[in-house]
Regions:
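Conserved acyl-donor/pantetheine-binding loop and adjacent beta-alpha core of acyl/acetyltransferases
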Residues: 5-43
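Conserved acetyl-CoA-binding loop-helix of GNAT-fold acetyltransferases
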Residues: 41-66, 85, 89
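Conserved beta-strand-loop-alpha-helix junction that forms the acyl-donor binding cleft
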Residues: 44, 73-84, 129-131
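Conserved GNAT acetyl-CoA-binding A-motif
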Residues: 65-78, 104
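Conserved active-site alpha-helix within GNAT-family acetyltransferase domains
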Residues: 67, 78-97
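Intrinsically disordered, low-complexity, positively biased terminal segments
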Residues: 95-167
Length: 167
């Protein structure tokens, strides 16, 4: 709140039934010992946009969730460049692309709080245009995860994909 005005709102699902429902919709398979939380929407008042509020609230959520959960799952629209950049900056990895919420295309992203599963091997990474859904899905199927958004002068935005340590 700022001067009695709500600046931002963010949702998070931590209960097992809620997270299982989201994971089923996203078609995400996790290890048996994982206990994920799932973040939903984050809205920021127009007056406060551009001040990293989404980024800061994401870290606040992580402080709460990391105590009792092994990972955090979220989705971002491929059309939301700033939101995608914020989430990737928070060390999330793109692990899927799926139509959810009534047919809207979303990147499915995961952040693992277990240190042994965080590394990616950036040597030999792939650079895929953000609009090339099939190339991204192929990379994910081959064990790559999206980790960075880059802007190319002539060809627009691309996502860097690297092999995950477990792959």
């Amino acid at each position: 709140r700022h001067k009695g005005k709500l600046v931002t709102a963010r949702t998070i699902k931590m209960g097992r039934a809620w997270t299982d429902e989201a994971l089923e919709a996203y078609e995400i398979k996790l290890d048996e010992d994982e206990r994920p939380a799932v973040t939903g929407f984050c809205v920021v008042d127009w007056e406060f946009r551009g001040n990293n509020v989404q980024y800061l609230t994401q870290y606040l959520v992580e402080d709460i969730v990391a105590e009792t959960h092994t990972s955090l799952i979220t989705t971002v629209s491929p059309k939301n460049i700033f939101g995608l950049d914020n989430i990737l900056t928070c060390n999330f990895r793109i692990v899927g692309i799926k139509e959810v919420y009534g047919g809207y295309l979303r990147f499915i992203l995961k952040k693992d709080f277990r240190p042994s599963l965080l590394p990616i091997w950036t040597h030999g990474h792939l650079q895929i245009p953000i609009r090339d859904k099939s190339a991204q899905m192929k990379a994910i199927a081959e064990g790559y995860a999206g980790y960075k958004l880059v802007r190319k002068h002539k060809s627009g935005f691309h996502i860097l994909y690297a092999k995950t340590a477990a792959a």
